Amino acid sequence: MASSASLETMVPPACPRAGASPATSKTLAFSIERIMAKTSEPRAPFEPRPAALEADSSQSKKLLNLCSPLPCMIPLQPLGYEVPSKTLLSYSEFWKSSLRAGGGGGGGSGGGAPVCGASGLCKTNCGVCCKAELGLAPSALPAGRVIKPQVINQAVGLPASGSLYYFNYLDSTAYPPSELLGGHLFPSGLLNAQAPTSLAAHPKLFLLENAKLASLAADKFPHPASYPHKERLHAPLEQVLKENSALTAERGGVKSHSKLPGGSTDSKPKNFTCEVCGKVFNAHYNLTRHMPVHTGARPFVCKVCGKGFRQASTLCRHKIIHTQEKPHKCNQCGKAFNRSSTLNTHIRIHAGYKPFVCEFCGKGFHQKGNYKNHKLTHSGEKQYKCTICNKAFHQVYNLTFHMHTHNDKKPFTCATCGKGFCRNFDLKKHVRKLHDSVGPTATPSAKDLARTVQS
């Protein structure tokens, strides 16, 4: 009895679709020995179903009764990641289309093309088991789409690189995860372990050529972390998938249109270089927007204050100043601002956060613009000079406000003492130091009049 039990474990049961007479006689002999045996033996994990139930199951979405009772182990990618059809296939749909093309809709032994025969490891150039026998065209393969695999989370006998592998089961009830994770059902190329000798002769384990992709990814990632739900892969693994997709397309003679991030179907890069500074842009529109930096043109002018801007988007943001709408309010001091970015910069004052530090004197600043203006004081260069008094300034806007001192234009007037100032900043500073600690109290009419005179 012991010899019969060992013989039964070493030789797998015959394929229900093979229909060969030697396999039928062997199965009958095994059945007689099992009946005569008194020892209890485990039930077969898969039994062929009647032809009536077989026809009903062919219409269902989940294909349970295939040639192999073992689940088809396919290395998939993390959940929610879309890949081209050459890299990853929906093998359940593939088997449905293959059986229809071969004429094998029922579970009988005759009729239709033979499925899988006695092949243990599929070595066809297509990477899909029995595609050459079935004669499937590449158009029958499903297009690339998001596939939701079942993820194995147990760590029974798996190495550290096992967390990279996601498997899709055609029949997850046939074998529990504990048996699948035992190691005897996995190929050596997939888990970097020595496979049993009986694996090579197993006629019902279809190892696909895409297992090379998982093995290659394991070399790139020796100790990967678990991928969360619908999260993008890291850049090295994306590169592995991209290279594998290109190799598969070359073998099949099909033009690859990669949908991976960073992939481009256009082989000619579009580079537009600025002739003045040499800066490169990917579109002609961006180069056109950049050119006013060198020409000094400000075609977009504000109708209220007359200030010019290089871009229309900057003018739109500037117009919010004149509407006096300040929806963004500080929770600590109650000060309101026109834009949320200005509020975020203001919050740094309360937190004492000064990320921009001068490398010459160590002084910190809340804003990057103030930091750049301060650095000009260390250079000693004042290229903007007044034509009347020859006073020099670091920036052009300081020269613009200085010119108001020569034409007696002081558009910003204090509502308390009536003193005029060239800049609104000077008015706020005057009120904060002399009159109160709240802020400027200039009337709106005075501000509007000041901006009208300035324009």
UniProtKB/Swiss-Prot annotation:
C2H2-type zinc finger locations on the chain: 272-294, 300-322, 328-350, 356-378, 384-406, 412-435
Tissue: Highly expressed in neocortical layer V, moderately expressed in layer VI. Expressed in subcortically projecting neurons.
Cross-referenced InterPro entries: Znf_C2H2_sf, Znf_C2H2_type
Keywords: Developmental protein, Differentiation, DNA-binding, Metal-binding, Neurogenesis, Nucleus, Repeat, Repressor, Transcription, Transcription regulation, Zinc, Zinc-finger
Record bears the keyword Ligase: no
UniProt cross-references to Gene3D superfamilies, sorted A to Z: Classic Zinc Finger
A single cellular component GO annotation: nucleus
Region (Disordered): 1-22
PANTHER family with a match to the protein in the record: ZINC FINGER PROTEIN, ZINC FINGER PROTEIN 771
Record's function text: Transcription repressor. Required for the specification of corticospinal motor neurons and other subcerebral projection neurons. May play a role in layer and neuronal subtype-specific patterning of subcortical projections and axonal fasciculation. Controls the development of dendritic arborization and spines of large layer V pyramidal neurons. Plays a role in rostro-caudal patterning of the diencephalon and in prethalamic formation.
Family: Belongs to the krueppel C2H2-type zinc-finger protein family.
Name assigned to this protein: Fez family zinc finger protein 2
Organism, as annotated: Mus musculus (Mouse)
Name of the gene: Fezf2
